[in-house]
């Protein structure tokens, strides 16, 4: 099957281009692996750098090496060849940037299933909070501002890459997968696998994640900024804290928004680590926390109350916190026993929670042509 698809790359490029529009028209042809007689950068934007641990035609063997080589201005694209990359990645350049994970033509057009089974690129590390390390310093992948800058990347995109923090097989402390702060960043068809604090949208961060899966146990969607998760799978590896743990800011819509998604017991969990009705949708990091679930399937692991207080002496959810649901489904989507402070939205009320509404306009840094 692989050879047949490779043959198509040689003789039917026009037909192939029509196929790749099912993913992202701008980049999918670039992402497909090519026959050895063709450049791996066929179909890529001009100036694209190629990273590979095995292909001698690569410009670099490390993702971070490629990033450090980039000029400070202009749009930059990096294609990452198939492989497992043990490194931390830190992006501080301000101009637009794209990271592309290579795809096998034989599986690239299969439904992702939000498990990223078609992804060929993994970036991992294993740091966790110890010996004075901060949360942010444990992140496998960071997009933030550089020294002296007011803001970082204005338009970062990543496609079909699996990011993982392998600090432990069970939460031992905070161990981030991502840190997106002072930047606009979007992710397509990716996986983020961790335990505690997997996903972090930090101060002045704006993030969009689609067609992806996020694994975690404790507060694994947390932060200060604005994060929209569209058509994702949230996979509970265990039940600790809540899925979301946000710190809101007065007068803003900073929060976590989960739409058209699924919450499930992680495939690597068991009945001991994820028991029925024990996982909470969130807990408030401060009393202005925002978390909204729209049209989301929730399995039997979700607690009937939905949300819980922070704990550690904060034993109530204040009415300044905004927790809300609309059209939840599945065994855990029964809203009859939700905490009284939660907002159970009507169809009219739910209409205010859109990408454009949350980000105060249509974000130019989101690839709306990406199709699931």
Predicted regions and their residues:
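Sequence-level preference for short, compositionally simple segments enriched
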Residues: 23-372
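Fungal secretory targeting signals
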Residues: 1-25
């Amino acid at each position: 099957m692989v050879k047949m698809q490779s043959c198509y790359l040689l003789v039917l490029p026009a037909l192939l281009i029509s196929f790749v529009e099912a993913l992202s028209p701008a980049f999918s042809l670039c992402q497909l692996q090519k026959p050895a007689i063709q450049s791996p950068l066929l179909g890529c934007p001009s100036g694209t750098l190629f990273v590979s641990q095995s292909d001698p035609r690569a410009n670099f063997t490390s993702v971070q090496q490629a990033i450090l080589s980039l000029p400070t201005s202009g749009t930059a694209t990096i294609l990452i060849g198939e492989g497992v990359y043990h490194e931390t990645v830190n992006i501080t350049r301000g101009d637009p940037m794209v990271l592309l994970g290579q795809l096998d033509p034989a599986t690239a057009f299969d439904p992702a299933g939000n498990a990223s089974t078609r992804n060929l690129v993994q970036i991992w590390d294993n740091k966790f909070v110890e010996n004075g390390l901060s949360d942010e310093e444990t992140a496998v992948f960071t997009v933030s501002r550089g020294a002296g800058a007011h803001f970082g990347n204005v338009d970062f995109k990543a496609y079909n890459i699996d990011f993982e923090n392998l600090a432990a097989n069970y939460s031992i402390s905070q161990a981030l997968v991502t840190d997106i702060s002072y930047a606009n960043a979007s992710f397509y068809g990716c996986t983020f696998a961790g335990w505690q604090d997997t996903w972090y949208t930090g101060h002045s961060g704006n993030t969009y994640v689609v067609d992806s899966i996020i694994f975690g146990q404790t507060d694994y969607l947390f932060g200060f900024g604005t994060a929209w998760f569209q058509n994702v799978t949230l996979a509970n590896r265990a039940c600790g804290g809540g899925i979301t743990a946000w710190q809101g800011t007065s007068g803003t819509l900073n929060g976590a928004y989960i739409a058209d998604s699924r919450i499930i017991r992680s495939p690597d969990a068991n009945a001991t680590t994820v028991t029925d009705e024990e996982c909470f949708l969130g807990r408030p990091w401060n009393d202005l926390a925002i978390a909204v679930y729209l049209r989301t399937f929730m399995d039997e692991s979700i607690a009937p109350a939905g949300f819980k207080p922070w704990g550690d002496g904060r034993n109530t959810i204040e009415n300044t916190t905004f927790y809300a649901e609309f059209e939840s489904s599945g065994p855990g989507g029964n809203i009859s026993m939700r905490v009284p402070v939660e907002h159970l939205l009507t169809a009219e009320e739910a209409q205010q929670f859109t990408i454009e509404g949350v980000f105060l306009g249509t974000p130019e840094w989101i690839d709306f042509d990406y199709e699931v």
